């Protein structure tokens, strides 16, 4: 069943999004998933938008990442303790052996942190900004020394993932299925 649903999402992406002016319609995707098999009575699908950037290694660079969609932030300080709505893949910075990550504080600040026994330890609470209205993320003077593997494979990019404010976000070019649970 899982592979059938992933195939449905892939087909939706190919037929609806990867053509000129293709628009993502959440309700249509949900219906397509429900129609995949008679055993599916309904589904809860959460959308996230991901952008990748290729860092300039061993240089303090300001990065601008444009999601081109409004981002979910219903109130100032939303989800601060859990890391806001921004998440990143790992990387190392100059002067540290720790694997670093990015998140946000729900107030427009991008934070740089590493994990100690699973607990976030913030190294810089103002590594950049996130504009929830425009979807622009700015990372200021970030000096990346290396990029971590992603999904067990070598990578040359840092992935940034956010929650859109609307399920019918406009700027999707393709969809990828990502399961968070096997049920």
Where are these regions (language model features)?
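C-terminal, active-site-flanking charged/polar segments
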Residues: 39-43, 49-54, 129-169
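Short conserved micro-motifs at the rims of enzyme active sites and ligand-binding pockets
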Residues: 60, 171-172
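Acidic, low-complexity glycine/serine/threonine-rich segments
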Residues: 1-62
């Amino acid at each position: 069943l899982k592979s059938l649903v992933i195939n449905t999402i892939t087909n939706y992406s190919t037929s609806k999004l990867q053509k000129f002016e293709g628009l993502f319609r959440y309700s249509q995707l949900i219906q397509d998933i429900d129609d995949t098999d008679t055993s599916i009575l309904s589904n809860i699908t959460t959308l996230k938008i991901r952008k990748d950037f290729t860092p300039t290694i061993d240089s303090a660079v300001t990065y601008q990442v444009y999601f081109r969609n409004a981002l979910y932030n219903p109130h100032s300080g939303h989800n601060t303790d859990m890391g806001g709505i921004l998440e990143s893949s790992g990387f190392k910075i100059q002067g540290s052996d720790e694997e670093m990550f990015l998140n946000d504080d729900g107030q427009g600040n991008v934070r740089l942190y590493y994990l100690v026994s699973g607990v976030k330890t913030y190294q810089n609470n103002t590594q950049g900004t996130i504009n929830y209205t425009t979807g622009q993320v700015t990372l200021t003077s970030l000096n990346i020394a290396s990029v971590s593997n992603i999904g067990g494979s070598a990578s040359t990019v840092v992935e940034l993932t956010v929650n859109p404010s609307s399920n019918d976000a406009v700027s999707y070019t393709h969809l990828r299925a990502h399961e968070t649970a096997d049920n």
